Design a protein with these regions (language model features):
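PLP-dependent amino-acid enzyme catalytic core
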Residues: 22-388
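Serine residues within intrinsically disordered or low-complexity segments
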Residues: 2-3, 28
Length: 388
């Protein structure tokens, strides 16, 4: 690794390193944020575009949500990922995978990007892929929200809907693989199997959270996240384990569709983006804390209340994540510092039950939640490139 470059302190005590190539903040045992050098001689990499995109991804605010839960005041810390380029946490993974693919010579300008997704990943690859000049094809189950399809199409990507009869999510993956096999010059990100998905959150999301909490002189006591690909929860699990030892990262899934517990598709649910019919290969349950279960209706009501009571407009999985985090914080007591993610905002769910009247059933956890206030902990620096 080259040692030639400029180094300066960033906001919140983070160090930023400027080199001739890209500058990344990375996880380190000795400091909350360190660097990793990406040489400028990537495989015909459109470096100016990647640099520009990297400035739009990561470095998101951390929200401190002040609640009363089961009669006890709690503060939950939520990374507000709607501030990314396309408005979701998936931008982190998409940019990281494409940067690494260029570095390893796995993709070249003009190659087609083909991916299977429930929506947010497709939006991220459509936007970032088109910005880099790639044709993009997105395969997705045909029951995802209409907004997702329209956004992807507006970004110049082709959307191939896959019915339940054609295999749904697993059928989407199969069809993307078949297209890549039968066509020339196709790059498959393979988000469910790609270790770079985990690495993206290990190198960016985790260190950002650690640095932001450090400004409050706090360290995380647990992490909670719904599992779609599993990249977020696995990346944070690794980061927390290396930095703080015995700090659990808890995977979360819909109580009415417990894929992680059963190992296969079971039941139906309305939390788009998690529990996608199978357990991804990058998910290692033995490295995670216990699985948390949240009813989809409970998550919907909680997301609705975050918007209507605090003005924080988030997607359905964010409501589930908040409820799961509150459960863990309640178990840990007054010293808990539980972190989660608000993966996106509510704009891609306007045609779903998120914008319908949802019955708040007696057994729902949201009945135990009183939302009091929130404050914003600004990021110290993005986990992606910050200077050139």
């Amino acid at each position: 690794m080259s040692s030639v470059g400029n180094t300066r302190r960033a906001r919140g005590g983070c160090t930023r390193h400027a080199f001739g190539g890209f500058i990344f903040l990375d996880a380190s045992k000795d400091a909350g944020v360190a660097y990793r050098y990406i040489p400028p001689g990537m495989s015909k990499v459109p470096s100016h575009k990647l640099t520009a995109l990297s400035r739009l991804i990561g470095g998101t605010p951390l929200l401190e949500i002040h609640c009363r839960y089961r009669g006890r005041e709690q503060r939950i810390y939520a990374k507000h990922e709607a501030y990314n380029f396309t408005g979701s946490i998936k931008d982190r993974m998409a940019l990281y995978i494409l940067q690494r693919a260029y570095l390893n010579g796995e993709i070249a300008p003009g190659d087609v990007i083909a991916e299977a997704t429930s929506g947010n990943t497709g939006i991220s690859f459509a936007a970032i892929g088109r910005a880099l000049g790639h044709p993009v094809r997105i395969y997705m189950p045909d029951w995802m929200s209409r907004e997702r399809v329209l956004v992807i199409q507006s970004l110049g990507a082709a959307v191939i809907p896959v019915s339940a009869e054609l295999g749904g999510f697993l059928g989407s993956i199969r069809m993307a693989d078949e297209f890549a096999r039968d066509s020339g010059r196709v790059f498959r990100p393979q988000q469910f199997d790609n270790a770079a998905n985990v690495q993206a959150h290990y190198e960016t999301t985790g260190p950002e959270i650690t640095a932001q909490l450090a400004t409050l002189e706090r360290v995380p006591s647990a992490f909670v996240a719904g599992v779609g690909t599993g990249g977020t929860v696995m990346g944070l699990a690794r980061h927390l384990r290396e930095r703080f030892g015995d700090v659990a990262a808890h995977p979360l899934e819909p109580a009415n569709s417990p894929t992680l517990r059963t190992g296969h598709k079971v039941g139906r649910h309305r939390i788009q983006g998690i529990s996608d019919e199978f357990v991804p290969s990058i998910v290692k349950l033995g490295e995670l804390g216990r699985i948390l279960d949240i009813w989809d209706g409970d998550a919907i009501v909680m997301s609705q209340r975050l918007a209507s009571e605090l003005g924080i407009a988030v997607g359905i999985s964010s409501g589930a994540n908040l409820l799961g985090a509150l459960e863990i914080a309640h178990e840990q007591g007054n010293e808990a510092c539980v972190v989660t993610v608000f993966c996106d905002d509510n704009k891609k769910y306007l045609s779903t039950d998120l914008c319908s009247d949802e019955e708040c059933k007696e057994h729902y956890l949201c009945n135990q939640v009183e939302l009091l206030d929130f404050r914003v902990i600004q990021p110290c620096a993005s986990g992606y490139a910050t200077r050139t």
